[in-house]
């Protein structure tokens, strides 16, 4: 299978917040911007396995396949790769997670998430999430 991107976010339905990742300035792709946790597939992974691995690497937490909800998937023409986006319902506190990559991460209220410096694909996919939630 060709390399693909798999990523996503945690969502707390009680507080209506999403957990997003702030990229550091060492990356060539969207430095210092907020986006989803995730990355490129490795070996023979399927998308959900890539998402689980990336969350483990970036937040230090384990997800079960059954907790993961597919949001959307499509061809990212700009990068010529398929993009799979997932989310997980969670009320985990920030203190229970450990940043493994990037500059920061935080719970952000949906009411003002679009005031953050988000990557273009994060904006598009969060809009899809909001359309499906309402």
Give the positions of each predicted feature.
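Nudix hydrolase/Nudix homology domain
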Residues: 27, 31, 98-134
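A short coil-to-beta-strand element that immediately follows conserved catalytic motifs
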Residues: 62-71
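Conserved N-terminal beta-strand and adjoining loop/helix that marks the start
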Residues: 1-19, 37-40
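Conserved Nudix-box catalytic region and its N-terminal flanking loop in Nudix hydrolases
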Residues: 17-57
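Active-site-adjacent beta-strand/loop module that shapes the phosphate/pyrophosphate-binding cleft
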Residues: 3-4, 14-16, 72-96, 106, ...
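Residues that flank catalytic or metal-binding motifs in active/ligand-binding sites
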Residues: 4-6, 32, 82, 101
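Short histidine/acidic/glycine/proline-rich micro-motifs that form metal-
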Residues: 40-42, 75-76, 112-114
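Short secondary-structure boundary/capping segments
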Residues: 10, 25-26, 76, 96-99
